[in-house]
Amino acid sequence: MLSLSLSVANAAWPERPITLVVMYAPGGGTDTVLRTLATEMSAATGWRINVVNRPGAAGALATRYVMNKPSDGYTLMGTSSFNKYSRVGGGGDSRSWTDWYYMQAATALGSWAVRPESPYKTFEDVIAAAKASPGKLTISTSGAGGQWHEVAAVVAHSAGIELKYVPYASGQRAALAGLNGEVDIAGGGVHEHIQFVDTGKLISLQQSGLTDITTKSGKVMPSLADMLPSVQEQLPPNGTYNLGIRRDTPYEIIKQVEAAFIAAANSDKFKNMMAQRSFVAEVKVGDAADRRAAELETVSAATFERLKIPGAKTAAELGLPDPGNFNQWWPPQGYRALPPTPE
């Protein structure tokens, strides 16, 4: 495990509690992962980390809040997908790989499900009904322009249907909206649906993994790849969960936070939580995380432009390449990776 000893220059940091601002409401995947990380970071270091939620505008509200705080390491950011929707959706200008230092802990799969009494028992039923009544079937999302909105829009586009997207403050609330009959289809992540599918309260229509998922009770969450193979070339990468810190924070403090993050992500309690929620462990830090952040934003900018998402900025406006040219574009002019921690 990485050493968590402080440098002499910053031995007194932190002198007070740290605040972790989560961009979605309590109960969803982002909140669950970041709260567990905060608990395990505290256990590894003795730091006191308070978690607060500031949902809204697909992360833009939380982003502005943290950006308006001093860059002293006392206010951290908890996001999904490197907070890519804030900039792509027009809610902010900060870039994830130049203005922030993000660390990735895990990834998650998308999911659609319905109540047992729904007239739609399969993904094919939804396609047929949506084609018969374009734009009438409703699906819940974790927020306008967010991860599960993007995934649902790409699936609908690939299937040749139109849906009505109903935003909620988190993936968990989107799942509950489907459970309570507020929408025709519950959107969200596998981790937010699997417990309800397992107990028979929801029926799985599809999930974005490459293979079927079988719950503890034997219920099957079918892979979208088997029903709509062409969508795999268009789907955005699966959702990720990230801890961020302002990049203009003193370097020694950033590396202390990174060391605590890595210790937390490798803890038994964090790994057990991920297994229970069907998350996938995938830790990235440094230039690998920066590259991933830029790649995800590039894919989403192209997707939002193609789907004509209202208010979204184009790749040209954001200074991003076509996804097919990303490898040639990265690293962009002016990019500077943070130095790695000395051995």
Tell me the role of every PLM-derived stretch.
Residues 33, 37, 62, 122-125, ...:
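Hydrophobic alpha-helical segments typical of transmembrane helices
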Residues 1-5:
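Bacterial N-terminal signal peptides
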Residues 193-266, 271, 320-343:
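C-terminal lobe and pocket-closing loops
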Residues 41-44, 65-75, 87-173, 240-273:
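Hinge/capping helix and adjacent helix->loop/strand transition within the periplasmic-binding protein
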Residues 19, 53, 141, 203-208:
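Structural signature of the Rossmann-like NAD(P)-dependent dehydrogenase/reductase core
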Residues 244-309:
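Secondary-structure end/capping motifs
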Residues 11-98, 136, 160-196, 268, ...:
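N-terminal (or domain-start) structured segment
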Residues 18-20, 27, 51, 66, ...:
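Residue-level signal for nonpolar/aromatic packing positions in well-ordered secondary structure
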